[in-house]
Amino acid sequence: MADSTPVRMPRAPKLRASCDECGAAKLKCDRGHPSCGRCISLGLKCVYGVSRKAGKPRRDAQSATRPPPTPGDSGPPLDYNSFGPTSPPSSVGDGATLASGLLPGAADLSPLDWGPGSSSSYRAVVDLCSRYAKEPMRMDDTAMSSVWDGFLEPSLFATYGSPVQVARLAGGSVPFSAAPVRDLPI
């Protein structure tokens, strides 16, 4: 009994438009075959290598390697650990960048929520933490202290303790430092 599946011949690899020598020198190749004009004049071996561009795979090859999507499949789950910041903030204005790296959704806060003299920043950060934490975040959590470290006036720490305590006691009228604490001379 004969197999009804058509036999496909393998495609010949696609060659580069420019020869390897002109490509390496980043010069325009005249694409002459079997040798381009530049290679002939310089006495070089003219080779047209395989193209590095793969192109689009054929449609039937795509469907064979990937299962069909199931209804209600929203894609792979997001890994929120991959959103972390690459460096500590360098100024007060970078607080939103830090928080958006730590908390998905913090980037939605306006710049006014993070500037000096802000009164709603603390509540916004606690709200975001509570939304994305598996358990509601305690107000004195050390993770919150690390978010606010460097943004509150240093004199407040001596009187009230942690940044979280300062923010809680101030009730939304927390004085902010013009420069992060870590940048102030000791």
Curated annotation (Swiss-Prot):
It is found in: Nucleus. Keywords: DNA-binding, Nucleus, Transcription, Transcription regulation, Zinc. Residues 19-46 bind DNA. Its main location: nucleus. GO terms for cellular component: nucleus. It comes from the Eukaryota. One of its GO terms (molecular function) is zinc ion binding. Residues 52-98 are annotated as: Disordered. Transmembrane segments: none annotated. Signal peptide: none annotated. GO terms for biological process: positive regulation of metabolic process. CDD domains: GAL4. Transcription factor that specifically regulates the expression of the pgm gene cluster that mediates the biosynthesis of cryptic naphthoquinones derived pigments responsible for the coloration of the fruiting bodies. This is Transcription factor pgmR. The gene is pgmR.
